[in-house]
Amino acid sequence: MSRLMIVLVVLLSLAVAGLFLVKHKNASLRASLDRANNVASGQQTTITMLKNQLHVALTRADKNELAQVALRQELENAAKREAQREKTITRLLNENEDFRRWYGADLPDAVRRLHQRPACTDASDCPQRMPESEPLPDAGQ
């Protein structure tokens, strides 16, 4: 074989080896790109989820703020009504001697006993009780 043929065979061998090296590198880069795309997709999903959570949180915060404003207004109105009641009671106490005596008198024993709760040793000893926040039922019914 001539030298030219040997050089061509060596060059062809190097070209084939280079081709296999480039093919391997291409496969490696493709796998790396797929992993990066998967990570980016996961991050995009996380970003979307966080944006939705932020939107929900902001909506709730707005609703809570409006509810707080309404409750503050109700509290202010209740305080005004309570102050007006106190003024009325004070005025009536100053104007009416009978009302002043009634207001200052002790409650009758029967009424006082309604507000007292006997101690219970266990649950079976206690009758069903009404919570303090609920009014007592009318005894005449």
UniProtKB/Swiss-Prot annotation:
Origin: domain of life: Viruses
BP terms from Gene Ontology: killing of cells of another organism
Keywords associated with the record: Coiled coil, Cytolysis, Host cell inner membrane, Host cell lysis by virus, Host cell membrane, Host membrane, Membrane, Signal-anchor, Transmembrane, Transmembrane helix, Viral release from host cell
Record's bilayer topology term: Single-pass type II membrane protein
Cellular-component GO terms for this entry: host cell plasma membrane; membrane
Main location: host cell
TM spans (from-to): 1-17
Periplasmic side: 18-141
Spans annotated as Disordered: 119-141
Record's subcellular location: Host cell inner membrane
Quaternary data: Interacts (via C-terminus) with the spanin outer lipoprotein subunit (via C-terminus). Part of the spanin complex which spans the entire periplasmic space. The spanin complex is composed of spanin inner membrane subunit and spanin outer membrane subunit.
Function, in words: Component of the spanin complex that disrupts the host outer membrane and participates in cell lysis during virus exit. The spanin complex conducts the final step in host lysis by disrupting the outer membrane after holin and endolysin action have permeabilized the inner membrane and degraded the host peptidoglycans. Host outer membrane disruption is possibly due to local fusion between the inner and outer membrane performed by the spanin complex.
Database matches in NCBIfam families: phage_LysB (TIGR03495)
Name of the featured protein: Probable spanin, inner membrane subunit
Classification lineage: Viruses, Duplodnaviria, Heunggongvirae, Uroviricota, Caudoviricetes
